[in-house]
């Protein structure tokens, strides 16, 4: 959401230019998605999420400091490529969860995600009025917190081996 705002507000992209960017993004993302899935299967969820969160942190800092429209467009495209690696969360969950718990846990996760999807944009929208850079630096911080959590994932997760530190009996 905020990357699009940046392109419009700071770099004065038109509706046609944003629409073209959406099309280009789809033309890149759709054929790349199966390859990302294969990459996750090859390197594992932990490594995939580590790559994703490092990439997103760098991208968000890039959004915060860029003065180049071309760089902002490249960051936007990379943002979506890295974000597509989030499917690793779903495969990780499938490996550690009891199959009987997946539906109810997915429902709770979906609900929490949607609450955050309403709350965070409103909060960040108010912050945006003060400084768009702060919004992107905050996004980078969230990515770094997610990175810390990904680093706590085992390389070979399964039921009973969900995290490296902080296991509860």
Where are these regions (language model features)?
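Helix-to-loop junctions at the C-terminal end of transmembrane segments
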Residues: 31-44, 128
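Structural signature of the two symmetry-related core transmembrane helices
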Residues: 47-62, 140
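Multi-pass alpha-helical transporter architecture, strongest
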Residues: 137-169
